[in-house]
C-alpha cells in the first residue's frame, strides 16, 4: 500500500493509513481502519493522496465515471460520481421547493465550492479560502477560525 485512501459511505468513514484513532477529526463520524482488500461498500466519495501527477492522471482516466477534484492543500484528490456536485444538488432543491438560486447564500473555501458560489445569488468566500474561490465570490468574510459565517449571519441577515 503506497497511498493513503479514505472512503465515505452513508454509515462511516473508512481509511487505510496509520494514524492514532484518537487524532481523527470527530466530524468524520465513525472512522474505521481497513486495508480495502475486501471493501464492498457503496461509497459517496473517495479521496486518495497521490504524490505523482502521472499516477493521479492515470487513476483519473481509469475512473471515467467519476469527477476528480484536487484539494488545494497537498496531493489529495477527491473522486465522486460524475456530475454529483454541490451546484447540481442546489439546483435540484430549488426545483423541488420552487424557489430561485438567487435567494441562496452559499459559503465556500476550496475548488469544489466554486460552481456553487457562482450559481447562488450570493457567493461568500471564507477568509481561509484559496485565491481562486475568493476571486469568484461576491464577498470575502472572516475565516473559519474567526467564526466568519456566524459574523456574516449576525451582521447581514439577522
Residue ranges: model-predicted function:
Residues 2-107, 111-114:
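Conserved acidic, metal-coordinating active-site core of Asp-based
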Residues 78-158:
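Mg2+-dependent phosphoryl-transfer enzymes with acidic/Ser/Thr/Gly-rich catalytic loops
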Amino acid at each position: 500500500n503506497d497511498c493513503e485512501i479514505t472512503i465515505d459511505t452513508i454509515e462511516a468513514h473508512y481509511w487505510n493509513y496509520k494514524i492514532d484513532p484518537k487524532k481523527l477529526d470527530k466530524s468524520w463520524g465513525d472512522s474505521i481502519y481497513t486495508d480495502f482488500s475486501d471493501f464492498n461498500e457503496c461509497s459517496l466519495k473517495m479521496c486518495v493522496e497521490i504524490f505523482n501527477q502521472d499516477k493521479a492522471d492515470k487513476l483519473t482516466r481509469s475512473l471515467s465515471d467519476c469527477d476528480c477534484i484536487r484539494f488545494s492543500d497537498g496531493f489529495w484528490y477527491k473522486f465522486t460520481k460524475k456530475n454529483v456536485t454541490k451546484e447540481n444538488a442546489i439546483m435540484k432543491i430549488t426545483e423541488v421547493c420552487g424557489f430561485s438560486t438567487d435567494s441562496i447564500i452559499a459559503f465556500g473555501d476550496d475548488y469544489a465550492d466554486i460552481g456553487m458560489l457562482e450559481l447562488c445569488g450570493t457567493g461568500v468566500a471564507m477568509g481561509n479560502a484559496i485565491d481562486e474561490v475568493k476571486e469568484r465570490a461576491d464577498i470575502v468574510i472572516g475565516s473559519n477560525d474567526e467564526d466568519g459565517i456566524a459574523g456574516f449571519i449576525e451582521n447581514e441577515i439577522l
